[in-house]
C-alpha cells in the first residue's frame, strides 16, 4: 500500500532535532494524503488510520490512546472561540467524516458514528452519532458479586 499519513507523522516526529527536514517530511505526507497529522499531537503507537489517513486532520496537542481507529476524513481540532483540543481514550472507533471539536474527552471504548459532530464529552463505552452527536447506546458494565 505504501507510506501512510502515520508513516510521515512518525518520521517527522523522529526528525524533530532537524526542524527543516522534519517540516519537509510532514509537508510531503500532508500533500500525498490530503491530510495533516501535526507533530505536536500525541498518538499511541497502536493507533490506526483508515485508508492510510486520507483527509484526516489532527491538530497540535490532540492525544489519542492505544488501539484507537480513526477513519478517513476525520477532524480532531479545537473549536473556534474555545480553548483546548480533543482527547481520545483507548480502543475508540471514530467513523468516516466525523468531527470532534473543542476540549472534549472521548472515553475508552467509545464509538462515534460516520459524519457525527462531537461537541461534548463522550462517556466510556458509549456510541454516539448525529449532528450534533447524541448518545445512541451505552455499554453496560458487567456486575460483580
Where are these regions (language model features)?
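Terminal amphipathic alpha-helical/low-complexity segments used for targeting or macromolecular assembly
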Residues: 1-35, 133, 140-145
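Left-handed beta-helix
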Residues: 39, 44-45, 50-51, 59-60, ...
Amino acid at each position: 500500500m505504501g507510506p501512510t499519513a502515520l508513516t510521515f507523522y512518525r518520521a517527522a516526529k523522529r526528525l524533530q532535532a532537524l526542524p527543516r527536514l522534519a517540516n519537509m517530511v510532514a509537508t510531503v505526507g500532508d500533500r500525498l494524503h490530503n491530510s495533516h497529522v501535526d507533530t505536536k499531537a500525541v498518538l499511541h503507537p497502536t493507533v490506526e488510520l483508515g485508508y492510510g489517513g486520507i483527509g484526516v486532520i489532527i491538530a497540535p496537542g490532540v492525544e489519542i490512546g492505544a488501539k484507537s481507529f480513526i477513519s478517513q476524513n476525520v477532524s480532531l481540532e479545537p473549536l473556534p472561540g474555545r480553548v483546548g483540543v480533543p482527547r481520545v481514550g483507548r480502543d475508540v472507533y471514530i467513523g468516516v467524516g466525523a468531527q470532534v471539536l473543542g476540549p472534549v474527552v472521548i472515553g475508552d471504548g467509545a464509538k462515534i458514528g460516520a459524519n457525527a459532530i462531537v461537541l461534548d464529552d463522550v462517556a466510556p463505552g458509549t456510541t454516539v452519532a448525529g449532528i450534533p452527536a447524541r448518545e445512541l447506546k451505552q455499554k453496560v458494565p458487567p456486575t460483580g458479586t
